[in-house]
């Protein structure tokens, strides 16, 4: 069976074959290994974003991860990054083996574009029962400018 006839197969093969040489014209537009790894980590980390009157809340599921294993950062003054790594428990007992491994292990990451009215000095993060909640306070709305009155002179 010739798999070349199926365009989806060739697209998938192109995505999986990420070369190391970035000087080549053919490879310049292909995604890098880092991009592919980050995209996979982001897709596997579900999150909700909630807007409150005075703050934004980012709620991220983190089952089985301790709070000290989670890193929350702000990059480029407007990107909230939640990252970390979930490690498999090191239990090596003789004669014990996994029959099925469905829980995702490895690195995780989510990036969120922060709105212009986010107060970067007022960000807090709390992890409780496997759910991380990052709260970003809003900046107060700017005060409306008062109209300037111009004195009309009679000539």
From Swiss-Prot:
Pfam families linked: HSP20 (PF00011)
Single biological process term from Gene Ontology: response to heat
Cellular component terms per the entry's GO annotation: cytoplasm
UniProtKB keywords: Cytoplasm, Stress response
Induction (free text): By heat shock.
PROSITE patterns membership: SHSP (PS01031)
InterPro entries reported in the protein's UniProt record: A-crystallin/Hsp20_dom, HSP20-like_chaperone, Small_HSP
Cellular localization per UniProt: Cytoplasm
Main location: cytoplasm
Gene3D superfamilies for this protein: 2.60.40.790
sHSP domain residues: 38-155
Family: Belongs to the small heat shock protein (HSP20) family.
Subunit-level organization: May form oligomeric structures.
This protein's name: 17.6 kDa class II heat shock protein
Gene of this entry: HSP17.6
């Amino acid at each position: 069976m010739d798999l070349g006839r199926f365009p989806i197969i060739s697209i998938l093969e192109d995505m999986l074959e990420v070369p190391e040489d970035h000087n080549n014209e053919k490879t310049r537009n292909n995604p890098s290994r880092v991009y592919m790894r980050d995209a996979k980590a982001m897709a596997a980390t579900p999150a909700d974003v909630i807007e409150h009157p005075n703050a934004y809340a980012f709620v991220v599921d983190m089952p089985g991860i301790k709070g000290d294993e989670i890193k929350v950062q702000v990059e480029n003054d407007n990107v909230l990054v939640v990252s970390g790594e979930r490690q498999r428990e090191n239990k090596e007992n003789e004669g014990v083996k996994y029959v099925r491994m469905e829980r995702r292990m490895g690195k995780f990451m989510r990036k969120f574009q922060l709105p212009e009215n986010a107060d970067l000095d007022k960000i807090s993060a709390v992890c409780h029962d496997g759910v991380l909640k990052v709260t970003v306070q809003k900046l107060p709305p700017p005060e409306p400018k008062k109209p300037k009155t111009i004195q009309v002179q009679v000539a």
